[in-house]
């Protein structure tokens, strides 16, 4: 771009120098005495060349040839005043055209800046006023969303004695509530489901702590001891079953000791099964089988039948507890 601009400036400078040289050359012949209509026309055209170059610097040669060509058919010999008038009107029109867009542009710029400045104080002055209430509204929301201060300020739920008694009775039956049971219990006690759920959670954790510390034996809460003692009776129950099996095997070595071994092995599994099943009252079928085992165990002692037949009953009695144990 700079090279093109420099070339244009050099061309303009050369055309101005040529125009000034022709101006000096044409001004000398009229002083010598060769004045005619052609001389007037050439001098007038040469006089106006330097005036054309400032107004239209880039296309000076074309404009000068255009006006000189237009001058000869119109003016003829006495057309000396016509180019002055024509050029004056053109220059006036050009200056007017140049001034009109410039004035319009200046007014447009001024209007834009005025409008911008009129909006600027509104934007700067109103934005802090609008931001302050937003900050005030957001601060309580942040406190609410945090939740921790709200949880600290939340009051504790105070249960009545009737509600506590009903919850305790339900907890003794089962430690875990299904969704329909929890909804029914909450509606009957006038509590929310969340309050019932949290009470059961707290009660379970408290019961586990008390049971682990030994404050609550498992016999006092057979129904409520479903979850914590659930790990211990299976440990003790296989021990009783295993204890009965070696005793039975050891007792079965001699023909005379088979009866006593059968009696002891039949009684110990039945007692272990009854003790184990006592912790689970909802297993009605298994508790029935345990009572059946307790009923069949005493029948083995009085009926001292011959050894092979009694040995057959011994295997039958030993097979029944094993089949009951497979339920677990």
Curated annotation (Swiss-Prot):
Q: Do the record's keywords include DNA repair?
A: no
The cellular location(s) given in this protein's UniProt record come to: Nucleus
Highest taxon above the source species: Eukaryota
DNA-binding region location? 152-211
Alphabetized Pfam families for the sequence: DLL_N, Homeodomain
Entries under CDD domains matching the protein: homeodomain
Q: Where is the composition biased (Gly residues)?
A: 250-264
One GO molecular function term of this record is:
RNA polymerase II cis-regulatory region sequence-specific DNA binding
Q: Which GO terms describe its cellular component?
A: chromatin; nucleus
Function, as annotated, reads: Acts as a transcriptional activator. Activates transcription of CGA/alpha-GSU, via binding to the downstream activin regulatory element (DARE) in the gene promoter. Plays a role in terminal differentiation of interneurons, such as amacrine and bipolar cells in the developing retina. Likely to play a regulatory role in the development of the ventral forebrain. May play a role in craniofacial patterning and morphogenesis.
Q: What family is this?
A: Belongs to the distal-less homeobox family.
Task: State the protein's name.
Answer: Homeobox protein DLX-2
């Amino acid at each position: 771009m700079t090279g093109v601009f420099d070339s244009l400036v050099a061309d303009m400078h050369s055309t101005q120098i040529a125009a000034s040289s022709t101006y000096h050359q044409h001004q000398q012949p009229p002083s010598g005495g060769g004045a005619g209509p052609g001389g007037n026309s050439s001098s007038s055209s040469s006089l106006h060349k330097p005036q054309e170059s400032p107004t239209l610097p880039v296309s000076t040669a074309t404009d000068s040839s255009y006006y000189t060509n237009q001058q000869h058919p119109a003016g003829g010999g006495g057309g000396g005043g016509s180019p002055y008038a024509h050029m004056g009107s053109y220059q006036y029109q050009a200056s007017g055209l140049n001034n009109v867009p410039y004035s319009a542009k200046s007014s447009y710029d001024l209007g834009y800046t005025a409008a911008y400045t009129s909006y600027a104080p509104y934007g700067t002055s109103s934005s802090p006023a609008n931001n302050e209430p937003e900050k005030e509204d957001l601060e309580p929301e942040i406190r609410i969303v945090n939740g921790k201060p709200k949880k600290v300020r939340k009051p504790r739920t105070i249960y009545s004695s009737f509600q506590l008694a009903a919850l305790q009775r339900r907890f003794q039956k089962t430690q875990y509530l299904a969704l329909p049971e929890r909804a029914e219990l909450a509606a009957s006690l006038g509590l929310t489901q969340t309050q019932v759920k949290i009470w059961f959670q707290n009660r379970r954790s408290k019961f586990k702590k008390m049971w682990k510390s030994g404050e609550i034996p498992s016999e006092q809460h057979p129904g409520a001891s479903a979850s914590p003692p659930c790990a211990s009776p299976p440990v003790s129950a296989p021990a009783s079953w295993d204890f009965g099996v070696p005793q039975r095997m050891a007792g079965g070595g001699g023909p005379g000791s088979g009866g006593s071994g059968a009696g002891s092995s039949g009684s110990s599994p039945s007692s272990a099964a009854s003790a184990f099943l006592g912790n689970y009252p909802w297993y009605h079928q298994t508790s029935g089988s345990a009572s059946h085992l307790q009923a069949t165990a005493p029948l083995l002692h009085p009926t001292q039948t011959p050894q092979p037949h009694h040995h057959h009953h011994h295997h039958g009695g030993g097979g029944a507890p094993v089949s009951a144990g497979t339920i677990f």
